[in-house]
């Protein structure tokens, strides 16, 4: 009888979760065949939720671990997993999607757009959201930038009456641009955070080796996707934001200060979680200036990432030999491809564990990881945020992983070319 190690079972569950993400549309269609409210319909809709996938398979793995050993072993394993990043994403997503923060962002973008000739306003609004916001992710963190960009683009692009070509091409470019746009600094992009301390990468290093290249690619990607959808975007009317003019400055400033404190100490869950509880109290006493917090959406995204971290920690046994055996170009292509099926932060973290990795190999590993960050929902930690916020604009309230993958190929290739040749 063949026996599997714990690592191998974790990889089987990981592979099952990856396949499951590509089948969510199938589960959604199957659910529609059953009476509404029935057990089968609810169960299939549950399986069709992208944010649930990795948490569900992680639960299956923990169940197996409890069965072959005992429940204490599963608890000990969970205690060894670092859930700081999922917790941070939950907190920053809930904060960044509040009414005062969004009102400030909407006011800046729409105000800048209104200065342009009327015929160019939609283009300026779109390009500002697709270029400036991803690059701001280098300073406010990628998850916060993803929330802002997704909510800015939602009323312009992600409505059900827009074409599938527009929605998927813009979503793909948004994911790629957020992934590479966070590389101007060493403290914003998850795959960079994982290696910056171990390899001594500071702000100057990131700007000189990644930042300027990625900024160019972000602009090129945004302009190309605009030109591809020029006629449809031009016909879209600018969103009308009701609350931005009436938001007091002190209210916006208080939210920005809370976010700044969380971002500054994003590596300390013991700090930012109590601070978030303080923030919840603040939003309650200032409820007249608030809209309902997106706690459900934020928790689902955190659950997805928590499952990814739980299973991803045990993938070292097969990823590390691949990383250590490849030449630079092979490693670059391999890292880009591997990012599609594993979180890019987990991939770069495993790179820090490979002894004797050359400086060139370090660069191409991270370059490939960020370039491939838009290929799938699991490729980059902020991606589930966009899916969670924008999926209502897609048929069946579900984003097709295959359509997203196909739409992301060209912007990913452009990112690879920029990081390899520039």
Which residues make up each language-model segment?
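Helix-loop-helix module between adjacent transmembrane segments
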Residues: 93-101, 119-120, 132-144, 176-185, ...
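Interfacial loop-to-helix junctions that mark the boundaries of transmembrane helices
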Residues: 1-9, 42-50, 71-86, 203-213, ...
């Amino acid at each position: 009888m063949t026996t599997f190690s714990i690592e191998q079972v974790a990889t089987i569950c990981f592979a099952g979760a990856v396949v499951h993400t590509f089948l969510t549309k199938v589960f959604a269609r199957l659910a529609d065949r059953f009476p509404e409210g029935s057990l089968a319909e609810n169960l299939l809709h549950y399986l069709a939720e992208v944010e649930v996938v990795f948490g569900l398979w992680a639960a299956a793995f923990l169940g197996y671990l409890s069965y072959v050993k005992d429940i204490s072993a599963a608890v000990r394993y969970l205690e060894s997993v670092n859930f700081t990043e999922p917790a941070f994403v939950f907190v920053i997503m809930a904060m960044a999607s509040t009414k005062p923060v969004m009102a400030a962002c909407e006011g800046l973008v729409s105000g800048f757009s209104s200065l342009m000739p009327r015929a160019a306003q939609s283009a300026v609004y779109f390009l500002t959201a697709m270029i400036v916001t991803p690059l701001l992710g280098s300073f406010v963190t990628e998850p916060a930038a993803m929330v802002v960009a997704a909510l800015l683009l939602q009323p312009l692009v992600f409505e059900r009456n827009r074409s599938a070509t527009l929605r998927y091409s813009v979503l793909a470019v948004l994911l790629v641009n957020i992934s590479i746009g966070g590389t101007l600094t060493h403290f914003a992009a998850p795959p960079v955070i994982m290696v910056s301390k171990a390899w001594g990468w500071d702000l100057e290093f990131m700007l000189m080796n990644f930042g300027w290249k990625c900024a160019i690619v972000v602009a090129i990607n945004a302009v190309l996707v605009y030109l591809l959808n020029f006629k449809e975007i031009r016909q879209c009317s600018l969103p009308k934001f009701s609350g931005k003019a009436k938001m007091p400055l002190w209210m916006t400033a208080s939210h920005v200060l809370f976010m700044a404190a969380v971002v500054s100490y994003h590596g300390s869950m013991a700090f930012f979680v109590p601070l978030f509880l303080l923030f919840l109290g603040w939003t309650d006493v200032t409820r007249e200036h608030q809209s309902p917090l997106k706690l459900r959406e934020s928790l689902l995204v955190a659950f997805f990432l928590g499952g990814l971290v739980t299973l991803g920690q045990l993938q070292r046994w097969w990823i590390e030999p691949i990383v250590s055996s490849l030449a630079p170009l092979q490693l670059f292509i391999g890292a880009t491809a591997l990012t599609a099926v594993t979180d890019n932060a987990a991939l770069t973290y495993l790179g820090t564990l490979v002894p004797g990795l050359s400086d060139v190999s370090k660069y191409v590993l991270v370059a490939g990881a960020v370039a491939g960050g838009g290929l799938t929902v699991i490729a980059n930690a902020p991606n589930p945020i966009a899916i969670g916020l924008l999926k209502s604009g897609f048929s069946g309230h579900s984003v097709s992983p295959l359509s997203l993958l196909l739409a992301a190929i060209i912007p990913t290739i452009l990112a690879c070319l920029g990081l390899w040749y520039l």
